[in-house]
Amino acid sequence: MSVLVNKNSKVIVQGFTGSEGTFHAEQMIAYGTNVVGGITPNKGGQTHLGKPVFNTVADAVKATGADVSIIFVPPAFAADAIMEAAEAGIKVIITITEGIPVSDMVKVAAYIKNRDCRLIGPNCPGVITPEEAKVGIMPGFIFKKGHVGIVSKSGTLTYEAADQIVRQGLGITTAIGIGGDPIIGTTTKEAVELLMNDPETHCIVMIGEIGGQLEPEAARWIKANGNKKPVVSFIAGETAPKGRTMGHAGAIVGGAEDTAEAKKRILRECGVHVVDSPAKIGEKVKEIMSK
C-alpha cells in the first residue's frame, strides 16, 4: 500500500517543456514514474521526452486518463495551473513552484475546497512512494521501500531523514513534502492522517518548523485518535529570532506558540517522540520499531 501516488498513477507535467519541467520529468521517467504526457500551451501535438504534449489539462486527461499532475509553472501563472488541473478532474495536484502570491493561494484554496482533489504544496519537493513513483524533485536513489511514512515541511530534511532511516536498515512507504508556504493544500495533520490509515505504514516521521500551528494541530489529532502508530518528530528553528522568516515564507515566529520550544512541548504532551537534533531521527525510528 501507499498513499497519494503509486506505480499505477498516470502523471502529467504542467510546464512540461520549460527547463525545470524538462529536467525533473526526465528524472521522474528514469525513476520509473508513469509519466503519460505534459502541458505547454500552444505546443499541443508535439512530443517531448517521447511523451505527448497537450495545450490544456482537459485535453491531456481526455487522451491519457491522467489522475496526478505535477506543476512547474512560474509563480505568476501557477494558481491558474492548479485550478485548471482541479477543473479537469485531476485527483492529486503536486505544486513545486515557490513564490506564488498569497492572494493567489487564497483564491486557489477557495476554488478547490469542495472539489474531489488533493493539493500538495506549493513550494514543496513533491511525493515519493519508493520503487513505484517519484512525483517531485527529490533524489530518488536515497529512498528505499519499507514501513516508515514521512510528512515534512522541508525538502532537504526529508532527504536527510530518509537517508538515516535507510541506513538503519528500514525503509519508506511514502514521503510527503507538504511545502513551506503560509497557505498550503494539505496540512501536516491531513498528511499524517493519510499515513495513519495506510496499513503498510507502521511508524511516521513528522518534520516541522517554527511558524503557524500545523504540528500542534497534528499532534492533538494523533492523541485524540489514540496514538495508533508511533510518531517521531523534529521541529527546525530552535534559535530563530522572532519576526524573521527563516528560509520558508511560512517559517516565522508570530505568537508565543509558534516557537520550536512551544511546539515541542505540545508534541511531547501528546505522546509524540520528539528529537532535538535532525541527526537523531533515524536512531529514534529504529529504537521504536525494534520494540
Where are these regions (language model features)?
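Catalytic-core regions of core metabolic enzymes
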Residues: 1-291
